[in-house]
Curated annotation (Swiss-Prot):
It is a peripheral membrane protein. Keywords: Cell cycle, Cell division, Cell inner membrane, Cell membrane, Cell shape, Cell wall biogenesis/degradation, Glycosyltransferase, Membrane, Peptidoglycan synthesis, Transferase. GO terms for molecular function: UDP-N-acetyl-D-glucosamine:N-acetylmuramoyl-L-alanyl-D-glutamyl-meso-2,6-diaminopimelyl-D-alanyl-D-alanine-diphosphoundecaprenol 4-beta-N-acetylglucosaminlytransferase activity; undecaprenyldiphospho-muramoylpentapeptide beta-N-acetylglucosaminyltransferase activity. Cell wall formation. Catalyzes the transfer of a GlcNAc subunit on undecaprenyl-pyrophosphoryl-MurNAc-pentapeptide (lipid intermediate I) to form undecaprenyl-pyrophosphoryl-MurNAc-(pentapeptide)GlcNAc (lipid intermediate II). It is an enzyme of class 2 (transferase). This is UDP-N-acetylglucosamine--N-acetylmuramyl-(pentapeptide) pyrophosphoryl-undecaprenol N-acetylglucosamine transferase. UDP-N-acetyl-alpha-D-glucosamine binds at T15, G16, G17, N127, R165, S191, I247, A266, L267, T268, V269, S270, E271, Q292. It comes from Shewanella sp. (strain ANA-3).
Length: 362
């Protein structure tokens, strides 16, 4: 189906969990002949990332207010009104047929501006607990979409999964490689790393290696490379460990791994399901409304992951879980299959089709 000449304004920013699913939808619609424009903020990751994918981006001046000081909260209403007017000007100039909000600071003013301009508004919530912006906008949106069931309680929402890259969906369909003797553990802590993983894993590997052959690919985050490498060396474990500040090729990392130790961001959970990998999930304890714990439950309840809250995490618990998986490769394989079984593989197409249908209705 082609829709040459149709226009969409995509609103997403702040974190990869918002931006990457939105990019998947934007790329899909661009391939259908749509014109795509982005609305974001100049000081967050979308300002750098979106132009790299070939999309034009407009900026509005807006910041979050949750947990900020009194002065900022008092000034917030005036700044919100200004940002709505800025978004309305973008809409008036671009004339989109539909507006898609996928989270981040710009989505709030942009969503209100879309409603004021009479442009159909579609929302997509990636997390199991909706963010404040989507919770408010859900009452005025034409269509509310979500990745997980029971996300919204006050409005009717359609469960469509999280849009992810096609390469990862294809990876999940590949035949699994025969397991080596060594358990291959991928440790991912996000762009800044996870201090708890960086602190514990050198000791975990040292303890495990006395009983079990293990190799580790550990993404430690910005400015943590030297310290974590040194910690592995002090434990005599530098030989079987690949320590990296960032992992640019997550497809290669997922293909390599037998099991993943990571946080439970919405995109991470959806990617683990799509590629069919078992995991040990340690939700970020300071996430708003503890939404990462709810995200994790999707895989935990399917029998595809173990949940270890950070408050109780220690070397012994990690050693115990990894030893269990190393000793039972059949269970490891079954956990991976259970992960794949709960994956929603056509989320990108579902979100795009909702946008297409609303644009055609006018």
């Amino acid at each position: 189906m082609t829709d040459a000449g149709k226009r969409i304004l995509v609103m997403a920013g702040g974190t990869g969990g918002h931006v990457f699913p939105a990019l998947a939808v934007a790329k899909y619609l661009a391939q259908q002949g749509w014109q795509v424009r982005w609305l974001g903020t100049a000081d967050r990751m979308e300002a750098r990332l979106v132009p790299q994918y070939g999309f034009d981006i407009d900026f509005i001046d807006i910041k979050g207010v949750r947990g900020n000081g009194l002065v900022r909260k008092l000034a917030a209403p005036f700044k919100v009104v200004r940002s709505i007017l800025q978004a309305k000007a973008v809409i008036a100039e671009f004339k989109p047929d539909v507006v898609l909000g996928m989270g981040g600071f710009a989505s709030g003013p942009g969503g209100v501006a879309a409603k004021l301009a009479g442009v159909p508004l579609v929302l997509h919530e990636q997390n199991a607990i909706p963010g404040m912006t989507n919770k408010l906008l859900s009452r005025i949106a034409n269509q509310v979409l979500c990745a997980f069931k029971n996300t919204f309680t006050q409005v009717k929402a359609k469960v469509v999964g999280n849009p992810i890259r096609r390469e990862l969906i294809a990876l999940g369909a590949e035949p699994k490689q025969a397991a080596d003797d060594a358990l291959k553990v991928l440790v991912v802590g996000g762009s800044l790393g996870a201090k708890v993983f960086n602190d514990l894993m050198p000791e975990v590997v040292a303890a495990l290696s006395k009983q079990q052959s293990i190799t580790v690919w550990h993404q430690v985050g910005k400015d943590n490379l030297t310290g974590v490498k040194s910690a592995y060396q002090q434990q005599g474990q530098e030989g079987g460990v690949n320590v990296a500040e960032f992992i640019d090729d997550m497809e290669a990392a997922y293909r390599w791994a037998d099991v993943v130790l990571c946080r439970a961001g919405a995109l991470t959970v959806s990617e683990l399901a799509a590629v069919g990998l078992p995991s040990i999930l340690v939700p970020y304890p300071h996430a708003v409304d503890d939404h990462q714990t709810r995200n994790a439950q999707v895989l935990v309840e399917a029998g595809a992951a173990f949940l270890l809250p950070q408050a109780i995490l220690d070397v012994n618990k990690l050693v115990s879980k990894l030893q269990l998986l190393a000793n039972d490769r059949a269970e490891l394989a079954q956990m991976g299959q259970r992960a794949r079984d709960v994956a929603v593989l056509d989320a990108t197409e579902q979100v795009a089709q909702v946008c297409i249908a609303l644009a055609e209705k006018g």
